[in-house]
Amino acid sequence: MNGETNVEQIQIIDSNKHVGETVKIGAWIANKRSSGKIAFLQLRDGTAFFQGVVFKPNFIEAFGEEAGTEKFQEIKHLSQETAVMVTGVIKEDSRSKFGYEMDITDLEVVGASEDYPITPKEHGTDFLMDHRHLWLRSSKQHAIMLVRNEIIRATYEFFNEQGFIKIDSPILTGSAPEGTTELFETDYFGQPAFLSQTGQLYAEAGAMAFGKVFTFGPTFRAEKSKTRRHLTEFWMIEPEMAYTTHEESLDIQEAYVKHLIKSVLKNQQYPLDVLERDTALLEKYVSEPFKRITYDDAIELLQKEEANNDYDHIEWGEDFGSPHETFISNYYGVPTFILNYPKAIKAFYMKPHPTREDVVICADLIAPEGYGEIIGGSERATDYDYLKEKVAEFGLSEEEYSWYLDLRKYGSVPHSGFGLGLERAVTFITGNEHIREAIPFPRMLNRIYP
C-alpha cells in the first residue's frame, strides 16, 4: 500500500490520540457519496463510525496520473459493506458527532460485498429483524450495543466494589421458581425439565453461603405477548443479600441504577449522541433521589387522576398495566419505587408485612418516560412453616422445593433481593422505543430467526 509498511494500525475510537498522524484502519464502508474529484466514505470498524475523504489529485500525486485516476474510480464504485484497509491522516472534524475524520491516501479492498440487502433507504421492521445479523452493523444498533456492554461492565464493577460474589444458577431446572405456567419445557433424560425463569432461589442459597451474591444470566418466559417491553429470552441481574432488610435493599437498588446511568454518561457519550438521547434527563435521574410510594398511594393517585388521563380504571388488588406505570413515573418525573403490593398478585416467597395481612414487603422500580418496571424485589420469607404453607397454596410440589425450604431450617436469617432486567434497563437508558433492539438476537413470540 504505497510503501507505507511501518504505518501504525489503530481503531477509529482512538483517532483523538493520532491527530495529524498517518495511520491505518481496518474497516467497512457503511455508506458513500462522491462528487467530481472527491469521494466521502462513511467508515466503521466496530468501535465507531467516521468519515474518510478521498481527494483525486492526492491519489494522482501519489500514484501517477493513470494509476491514481484508476484507483480513485475504483473507490468511487465500491459497494456498501466492502471491507477495506485504509491509510490516511487523522484530522479533527467539528461538524461530525464523532469529531474526527481521515484524509485517505491509500485504500486496499480486503473483502468484497455485493448486493448488500440493507441499503440506506427505509426498511420495514420485519425485514430488518430477518436480517438482524446485518442490521447490527448500523450506527443506531451499534450504539445501543455499546451502551448494553457498558451496563454489563458497570454491573460487575458495582457489585464487585460492594463485596458481592457472582454465582451461576442453572438454566435447566426441575421446577418452576415463580410457580407459573409460562415455561419452556424440555425432556431431561426421560423427566420434564424447564428453562429457568429466574436464578433467585439459587441465589438465596448462595447468600446463605457467601453473604452477598448476584447471578447474571439468561432467563426464559413463554409469554404470548407482543408488547414493546417483552422478550421470551432475556438477561437478568439478580442480587441476594443476607442480613439485609428491604429498606436497605432499596438503597442498594437506587445506587446500582444510578451507577449504571453515570457509567454510560461518563464512558459512552458518543453512542448517546448517535441515539440523540436527552442526557439532561439522565443527569437528573442521577442527581435527584428516586421517589418511594406505596401501592395504596399509587392506587389512590390513579383513581384521583383517571378522569383527565388515558388509562383504564383500576381497583385495589389489581396489578398495574403499562399506562398506569407510565402515568405514575411521569407524575413524579424520576424512577419511582412502588412498595407493598397485595400478596395475592405477588410471588410465594415474599415476606408478609408485619402489620398488614393483605400485603407483602416488596417493591417494583418504575422507570420514567414510559419505560415501565425495570426492577422487582422483596424481602424474602424466612419462616419455614409459613413458606411451606405458601408452597402448598400456590400448588407447588413440596418435594421439588424441599431444598429451598431447607434454607429456612438451617440458620434462616433476614434477607432481601431483587432482579433487574438488562434489556429493559438498556431500552430505558438509551431512550429507545422497543426492547427488541436491546439484545443482539431477540427472541419474541413468532421470532426465533436468525
Curated annotation (Swiss-Prot):
InterPro entries: Aa-tRNA-synt_II (IPR004364), aa-tRNA-synth_II (IPR006195), aa-tRNA-synth_II/BPL/LPL (IPR045864), Asn-tRNA-ligase (IPR004522), Asp/Asn-tRNA-synth_IIb (IPR002312), NA-bd_OB-fold (IPR012340), NA-bd_OB_tRNA (IPR004365)
Entry keyword annotation includes Transcription regulation: no
Pfam family, one: tRNA-synt_2
GO cellular component: cytoplasm
GO terms for MF: asparagine-tRNA ligase activity; ATP binding; catalytic activity, acting on a protein; nucleic acid binding; transferase activity
EC nos: 6.1.1.22
Family: Belongs to the class-II aminoacyl-tRNA synthetase family.
Subcellular location field: Cytoplasm
Oligomeric and partner information: Homodimer.
Keywords tagged on the record: Aminoacyl-tRNA synthetase, ATP-binding, Cytoplasm, Ligase, Nucleotide-binding, Protein biosynthesis
SUPFAM superfamilies, per database record: Class II aaRS and biotin synthetases, Nucleic acid-binding proteins
CDD domains, sorted: AsnRS_cyto_like_N, AsxRS_core
Catalysis: reaction(s): tRNA(Asn) + L-asparagine + ATP = L-asparaginyl-tRNA(Asn) + AMP + diphosphate + H(+)
Organism listed in the record: Enterococcus faecalis (strain ATCC 700802 / V583)
Broad class of enzyme this protein falls into: ligase
Classification via HAMAP family: Asn_tRNA_synth
Main subcellular location: cytoplasm
Protein name per the record: Asparagine--tRNA ligase
Source superkingdom: Bacteria
GO biological process, any: asparaginyl-tRNA aminoacylation
Gene that encodes it: asnS
